[in-house]
Amino acid sequence: MKNKIIDCITFFNENFIFDLRYNIIKDSVDFIKKYIDGLAMLKFNNFHWHLTEDQGWRIEIEKYPELNNIGSFRDSTLIGHYGDKPRQFDKSRYGGFYTKKEIKEIVKYANKRGINVIPEIEMPGHSQAAVDSYPMLGCSGEQVGVAPLWGVFKEIYCSKNETFDFLEDIIDEVVELFPSKYIHIGGDEAPKTNWKACGNCQDVIKR
């Protein structure tokens, strides 16, 4: 007696989010390729790549090199429990980012296996690493540090013309790397604390 196996995806979109905000894995290009192999085997067809965060900017941007010189690295990382008093940090510089060459290699590898890579560039929240790299993007105009721990932070993009120009430039470089018709722009967890105290933001709100 012959058996017939019918194998198909359950949903039109089978998505997997890959988040490296906290850690850059050693030899991570090869690691990601192995992950993609596993996703293909399990019939996933979308690889959602979380590339920017408060704790680190993980994608090369040529027009704004300080995103990688400053924003891709933090001076310390929380160790122990978030609720510890006092909190403990390792006081060790840590970070890294993916070059455009590496990203193209990963996207090509995924596409050959039927997987679409969707980049995520967070805005307006989860942008502390970017604001630290280019302080004019924030309400205070001052460096704020790349976040050394997880959480939701008040340092978000300010509604200045410079900010919108910056974000448009970022998106222009990102879409050149990813053939996906989608790009994720976050939109979550954006405290309005600084906006409420910012004259520029209040003027925009009142328009």
Identify the residue ranges that each predicted region occupies:
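Short, well-ordered coil/turn segments that N-cap beta-strands
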Residues: 14, 43-45, 111-115, 179-183
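Mature N-terminal, pre-catalytic/accessory segment of carbohydrate-active enzymes
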Residues: 1-45
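Aromatic- and acidic-residue-enriched carbohydrate-binding clefts of CAZyme catalytic domains
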Residues: 55-112, 127-165, 194-207
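Conserved, mostly hydrophobic/aromatic
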Residues: 39, 117, 185
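Active-site beta-loop-alpha junctions enriched in small/polar residues
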Residues: 21-23, 52-56, 122-126, 188-192
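Active-site groove signature of glycoside hydrolases
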Residues: 123, 167-194
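Aromatic/hydrophobic pocket-lining residues that form π-stacking "cages" and hydrophobic walls in ligand
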Residues: 35, 106, 117
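Carboxylate/His-rich catalytic cores and anion/metal-binding grooves
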Residues: 43-58, 113-120, 124
